[in-house]
Amino acid sequence: MAPKKKVAGLIKLQIQAGQANPAPPVGPALGQHGVNIMEFCKAYNAATESQRGNVIPVEITVYEDRSFTFALKTPPAAKLLLKAAGVQKGSGEPHKTKVAKVTWDQVREIAETKKADLNANDIDAAAKIIAGTARSMGITVE
């Protein structure tokens, strides 16, 4: 096995799938670590092409020799909930004003999608986490 490379930094970004470009926030975040920005943009866009329309979080590990690897995460629960509810944004005052309703089936479906990134042992626990996110956005779960 090759000797381990020394990690120089870890960058976390949320970028639209298939739309990474050198403009902020991507350019400055990668530039300060000396990463080839266009190389990352091409690799990210190729990896997320099938998920266009979603925001895909990415964790970029930068090594001392300026090479990098990246891991894609699942879209944020809030974005998935907004899409399921069919609204643009959550409530300004979530416990007073409710903006939409989602069913438990929709919540379970989102939990299935997010399971890899959630700190839950089973789908029921994951669904409760998603339901809590919905509640804090002013979305009612039925």
Curated annotation (Swiss-Prot):
There is a cross-link at K101 (Isoglutamyl lysine isopeptide (Lys-Gln) (interchain with Q-Cter in protein Pup)). InterPro entries: Ribosomal_uL11, Ribosomal_uL11_bac-typ, Ribosomal_uL11_C, Ribosomal_uL11_C_sf, Ribosomal_uL11_CS, Ribosomal_uL11_N, Ribosomal_uL11_N_sf. The keyword Aminoacyl-tRNA synthetase does not apply. It holds the Pfam family Ribosomal_L11. GO terms for biological process: translation. The keyword ATP-binding does not apply. GO terms for cellular component: cytosolic large ribosomal subunit. GO terms for molecular function: large ribosomal subunit rRNA binding; structural constituent of ribosome. Part of the ribosomal stalk of the 50S ribosomal subunit. Interacts with L10 and the large rRNA to form the base of the stalk. L10 forms an elongated spine to which L12 dimers bind in a sequential fashion forming a multimeric L10(L12)X complex. This is Large ribosomal subunit protein uL11. It comes from Mycolicibacterium smegmatis (strain ATCC 700084 / mc(2)155).
